[in-house]
Amino acid sequence: MNGFNVRNENNFNSWKIKIQSAPRFESVFDLATDRQRCTPDEVKNNSLWSKYMFPKPFAPTTLKSYKSRFIKIVYCSVDDVHLEDMSYSLDKEFDSIENQTLLIDPQELCRRMLELRSVTKETLQLTINFYTNMMNLPEYKIPRMVMLPRDKELKNIREKEKNLMLKNVIDTILNFINDKIKMLNSDYVHDRGLIRGAIVFCIMLGTGMRINEARQLSVDDLNVLIKRGKLHSDTINLKRKRSRNNTLNNIKMKPLELAREIYSRNPTILQISKNTSTPFKDFRRLLEESGVEMERPRSNMIRHYLSSNLYNSGVPLQKVAKLMNHESSASTKHYLNKYNIGLDETSSEEENNNDDDDAQHNRNSSGSSGESLLYYRNE
């Protein structure tokens, strides 16, 4: 091994291109991916049903994750002495995977992965699982009592997030959009990202949609949402929704009206590539330009904010789940009160003293949820 750490992020970025462009990459990746399938024994060992088995296709997001893990595994399989030789052939590594002949054991893979970059225990375990399935090895578990540096770092960030006043953050961004972005001209390339970010932010805040869902809406869609309070669409794709006809809801009126005002002056600005990180870059820039300081800004904090506010104001959990387009209310539970959302928007300071009792009473009353939702729509 070299006296210095040659296995690092910069070195990996160079190798990543080389690995992906290797002639055997796709065929060996397909083989490795197919080995992740877990066919039940009652099918695999049944003389009748085994001949009718079919490979269930992996979701695009799953394949994307698998490809990322596969590239890192190939990179970590290359010995240190070869890492500075970009003319090195990867045949040895691809042969190893194809023939399931071991070059490094799971623990050595862990060591090299940690040398490459700081990762969470969960990410590392998922990569190891992919590796052991791919190489037909016994299961390897990272010891329970282990906490990696990245886990400690994220734990500290989460502690800070609990004290983050989300309402103040959202109000700061809305004020910035109203004061600075609303009248910007999209003819200037530098301003386009801010305009896109502002429109998508307002749509997310008004509907509870995810960032890649919100950018699919047109000006006409916003008009329908504002006028009718609902939108039925067979063209807008929602995460984990198999239905061809999805329903979107107007949860907060004012952000949608602000989105429409900006969007109607720039009707083609959200026409960007389908598979791009641009919306996330726009979101981060919007926060930076607004003066909001967050260690780990995430677009789904808006969904957390809306879910918590709706639930705390008395909307039943099942109704909140429906508004968030969750298939199960169990998913919505993870959203509730993760952040300090700030003063309850439906209560005065005096009423906040009885907040918990009132909210529970409202959840037990079928009429209250409708009133709560109407309040949000008028905002």
Swiss-Prot record:
Residues 362-379 have a biased composition (Low complexity). Residues 346-379 are annotated as: Disordered. The keyword DNA-binding applies. One of its GO terms (biological process) is DNA integration. It comes from the Viruses. SUPFAM superfamilies: DNA breaking-rejoining enzymes. Residues 169-348 form the Tyr recombinase domain. The keyword Iron-sulfur does not apply. Residues 346-358 have a biased composition (Acidic residues). InterPro entries: DNA_brk_join_enz, Integrase-like_cat_sf, Integrase_catalytic, Tyrosine_recombinase_XerCD. Keywords: DNA recombination, DNA-binding, Transcription, Transcription regulation. GO terms for molecular function: DNA binding. The active site is at 210, 239, 303, 326, 335 (o-(3'-phospho-dna)-tyrosine intermediate). Plays a role in nucleocapsid assembly and serves an essential function during the final stages of the DNA packaging process. Participates in the processing of branched DNA molecules at the late stages of viral genome replication. Belongs to the 'phage' integrase family. This is Very late expression factor 1. The gene is VLF-1.
